[in-house]
Every structure is written in structure tokens, then in C-alpha cells.
């Protein structure tokens, strides 16, 4: 009897163990470790910033001296990082292709503090040849793959060796109140100092830019939904589409240049489609543009670009459609040796244009316009 009762007790205990619920597993914490604010300065600042970039929530670059032949490479930033330049950022001299600065990431905020300057001291490379020979010159700022509402604000860039800002692979980038001042290059051999070269990018807004240079103020080589507004362009080649054609991406669509001024420049407004190539230029708008002191062409639209303007017969492989030119003020703007408006289109390749309140005078009438849409003047 005792044995029976003992067995029953053991069975009951076992049943309790079996019936007891298993302990709840502990879920791993979903709270990410907070990233720290970081400040870097001096000759070791660039290397330290690059090594620590993933761990910093904010990066302050205070009077950083970047060594010669080095890219200040901030292309591995954590999402949402803010990068602020303070004081003067400088770069050592070396002949190489660059870039001197590279920034990439999602929801990245790049800012210039009051009085801050990014100064690559491009005059050390200037020789009048730009990217066509002479010294090998580094491009300045590769703003590549900046996405998800990234922004660049209040930068002051002084004297780039050649091109200033390359925008490529970006989607949702806003650039506000940036100054690119290469005006010293007018007398010291600056060449190919494009301010903004844009390719394969979408949803780009550049607002309030001030540009003094010796090449395109803006060149949109490919991309969609791009706006340049409230800008000043002085000394260069004006507001350009292209050249389009002969690249991996040859589509330009929905690009607007509005409420801006082009002065002291070779060209005012220019659209360049490369001869013998294919692509698309659609939905480009120039509106509310003031031209003054233009040396060569007030408005130049060409489908025979071949490394130089107006080379031979135009071709039709890159149609220019849905173009709008309106409220273009350029009375007396063009030098007497220049041309007010030149339009050279391939057969049937320029269509559905809007042309309203366009006044560009002071220069000569171009005598070799071709296939001009009836609404336009040439």
C-alpha cells in the first residue's frame, strides 16, 4: 500500500512538471546604442573622422587639414548623420584625379557653420588647361548616392582645381544657399570649373546658389525632376542641359531653371544634344531668367554638338520635346560679336515647344538655324 501511494505521489509530481508552462523567452533589445557627437580638427582630423564616421550621430569638422592625395571620404555614414564644417577646411597639394571630398548616405545633413570655408586652393593646379592637359587636377566634391531627404546647406567653396560639385546617383537631395567662388580663376588660369554636374539623379532641388566660375554653372547630363531656382551664375557657360548622348544614361526629363540670373558668361541658356547619338531631352523649362553681359550665345539649342558647338549637320537621335522658354529678359544682353539665339535641330527632332516673352538682343542674328519650331525665334 505504501509503495502504491509513493508511486501515485511521483506520478502527480511528474504531471505538474509536464503541465507547467515553459518560461517565456527573453526578446532581444530593439533599442540601438546611441551614437555619439564627434568633433575632429587639425592634420589628423580627416583620418579620425573617416575611421569613426559610422559611430557618430553628428560630425563636426573644425579647421581640418586634409593631407595631399587624400579624399575626405564620408561615404559610410550612418543614416541620419549631420556633418558640419567649421572654420577653414584645407587640402594638401598633389597632382591626382580626386575627389577631394566625398559624402554619401541616407538622410544626411551637410552644413556650413557661419564663416566656414572649404578651400582646396585650386590656383595651385590652374594652368589654363583644366581637364584637357597640363597638371592632373582633382575634382572637388563627389555628392554621390545621397538619398532620402538629404541636404547640403550654407557651404562656401573657394577655388576648386576643376569641377566643383558632382551630383550622381542621388534621389531626394536639396542644396540650399551654397556659394562656389572660383572668380580668381578668371585671371589665374581656372578652366573646366563646372559648378554642378548632374547625372543619373532624381528629385534634386538647388536653391539660392551663387556661382562664379569658368564653365557650366549647371550641366544636367542625365536625370529627372531637377530644379535650379533663385541662382546667380557669373563668369562661366550658363545654365546647360548636356551634353546629352554617348553616356550610360542619356535621359533628361522634367528639368526647370527658374528665377535666376546669368551674367558675364559665354552663354546664357544652352541645350546640347550630341551629334550621332541617341537619348531623350523632354520637359525642360527655362522661366524667369535674366541675362546680361553674354559674350557668345544668349540662347543656344543644338543637335549637332560634337565636343564643340554647332559642328556640321544636326541629327535626330536625341529629340528635344516639350521645351518651355518663357519670361527670358535679355535686352541688350549679348555682345555685338555674339549671337542672340541659335537653334539647330535635326529633321522632326524639336517639337511641342512653348516660347513666350523671350527678349534676347544686342548680338547678331544667327544665319544657319535649322528646323526651328514655328513658335520659336532664331
From Swiss-Prot:
Sites carrying sugar chains: 254, 327, 352
UniProt propeptide residues: 20-35
UniProt catalytic activity: (1,4-alpha-D-galacturonosyl)n+m + H2O = (1,4-alpha-D-galacturonosyl)n + (1,4-alpha-D-galacturonosyl)m
E.C. number(s) listed in UniProt: 3.2.1.15
Molecular function in Gene Ontology: polygalacturonase activity
Keywords, in A-Z order: Cell wall biogenesis/degradation, Disulfide bond, Glycoprotein, Glycosidase, Hydrolase, Repeat, Secreted, Signal, Zymogen
Repeat region (PbH1), residues: 147-169, 170-200, 201-222, 252-273, 281-303
Alphabetized SMART domains for the sequence: PbH1
Main subcellular location: secreted
The UniProt record lists the keyword Repeat: yes
Single Gene Ontology BP annotation: cell wall organization
Signal peptide (residue range): 1-19
InterPro entries linked to this entry: Glyco_hydro_28, Glycosyl_hydrlase_28, PbH1, Pectin_lyas_fold, Pectin_lyase_fold/virulence
Disulfide bridge partners, by residue number: 38-56, 217-233, 345-350, 369-378
Keyword Hydrolase in record: yes
Highest taxon of the lineage: Eukaryota
GO cellular component: extracellular region
Pfam families membership: Glyco_hydro_28
The protein's enzyme class: hydrolase
Active site: 215, 237
Subcellular location: Secreted
Similarity comment: Belongs to the glycosyl hydrolase 28 family.
Role this protein plays: Involved in maceration and soft-rotting of plant tissue. Hydrolyzes the 1,4-alpha glycosidic bonds of de-esterified pectate in the smooth region of the plant cell wall.
Protein name as catalogued: Probable endopolygalacturonase AFUA_1G17220
Organism: Aspergillus fumigatus (strain ATCC MYA-4609 / CBS 101355 / FGSC A1100 / Af293)
Lineage, uppermost ranks: Eukaryota, Fungi, Dikarya, Ascomycota, Pezizomycotina
